[in-house]
């Protein structure tokens, strides 16, 4: 077992079963990057993104990620997510940039993505409190979710319950990561969840920003057959928002490189460039 939880093995096999970790965490990290050739980019911003129930899935945001990964890598990536998330992606028609997709529950023993050089793992799994509580009952341990203290990555089931949580969440995400590039040639993998074991090395981070309604209205104005130089107040009047709101939204577009910001007098002039503005939003990648 590449991602063992010894307490669970002892429960179902034999209490005398012993576990010995052969490699240190540092050695495992080196093996992961140097021997297996994995390069991980994490795009979750610290969120678990538990997608098993489908409630937290945001197809527009995730679809923007799929599109930008394909653009960055120059090839269509393969995708692993939960069955309910994939169903929503299909309904919202955001899978065009994806080469092939599969859900977590259909990966056991699968080599479908063994030769894929680019992969995405979107969201993590959580089978519900009942799953953790059943393991607790089997082990005769008290297990209770303390959501007053935290949710997502801060969710706490107590000492034993947290071992079960990490087994179904972090370990399942890592197993999904290991589906890609199994032919020894490695892979670039984008992990859209914070649920990874702490020892797993992350080479870069991605930050996803979906444009709000105000920014979309400004994009519409800037793309019309009007001037290519705008003052903040003129944009605000066209869109029907305050100059402060216009300045904030224009600043986001400038930070993304879609327009240029020039200081003139006591205000700013915004210059429309030849860069095509993505109507969905922006994904920015940075080295960790």
Can you say where each PLM-predicted feature lies in the sequence?
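Short, cationic-aromatic polyanion-contact patches
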Residues: 264-286
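Conserved helicase motor "Helicase C" RecA-like lobe of SF1/SF2 P-loop NTPases
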Residues: 84-99, 258
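A short, conserved structural fragment
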Residues: 254-264
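Conserved RecA-like P-loop NTPase helicase motor core
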Residues: 100-199
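Interdomain hinge/linker at the junction between the two RecA-like core domains of SF2 helicases
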Residues: 2-59
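Short amphipathic alpha-helical interaction segments
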Residues: 240-254
